[in-house]
Amino acid sequence: ALSSAASDVYKRQVFKDSILGFVAGIQLSANDMVRPGDWVTLPSGDANGIVQEITLNTVKIQNFDNTISTIPPYTLVSSPFQNWRGMTQSGGRRVMKSITLDLTTLQFCTPEMLDRYRKEIPLMADYQPEEGVVPTNSQVYRVYIERYLCSLPVVNQELDLIISQKEATMYGVPIQVYFFSRNKVWKEYERIQSDIFDHLLAMVPKFDLKVYQYSD
C-alpha cells in the first residue's frame, strides 16, 4: 500500500511539473523572455551563460566555465533573471567604474598650473575655464577624462558618456566614469576597459592629484 501511495505521489508530481513546465514554456515564448543563443544570468548563481536549448521541462544553459546548467522553465518565469540580449543587440556594453582621488590633493588651479596642463597634455591644449571661474585640478581632470574617451573609436559616442564626482568618503573622492564600449565580446571588452583605466590612472599625477591608497 505504501509503495502504491508513493507511486501515486510521484506520478502527481511528474504531472504537476509537466503542466508547470508547459505553461512556463508558453509564457517564455509568448513574452519573448528567452531564446536559444541568449546570455542569461540567474542571481542565485545557478547559471551564467548561453541558452542552448529550451524544451517542455528544461532550459539548458552552457555556462562560461563550460559546465551545463539545466533549469526548469518555471524557474525563469517565477524568479528574476537577467537576459543580456538587449546589450548584445545594442550599440555598446556599459562600463562604470570609479577612480578615487586623495582629498588632500584637490586644489584650485593657478594660472601656472593651467598653462602647464595645456603644454604637457595635448588634449588640454585649448582648454579655457569659464569666465570668472577658477577650476579645481579635479574639475580639469574630469574634463580630460571626457575628452580622452571622446577621442577613442572604441567608445560609442552616441550612447551616454558621463563623468561625475560622487560624495566624498573617508576613502577619498570617487570620480565615476560611465560610458559604453562598442566591442561587447567579453575578452575584448575587459581588455578595452582595462587599457582605458590604466591610462586614466597614470594621468592622475599630471593634474597634481593622487589616487587614494589606504594605509594603517
Description of each model-found segment:
Residues Q27-R142:
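Soluble accessory domains appended to multi-pass membrane transport proteins
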Residues F22, I26, N57, W84, ...:
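Conserved, well-folded catalytic cores of nucleic-acid-processing
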Residues L2, F15, Q193:
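Hydrophobic (often cysteine-bearing) scaffold residues that line and stabilize catalytic clefts
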Residues K119-D216:
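Long, non-transmembrane cytosolic or organellar matrix-exposed soluble domains/tails
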Residues V14, S18-S29:
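Membrane-spanning helices that line or support transport/gating and their immediate boundary helices
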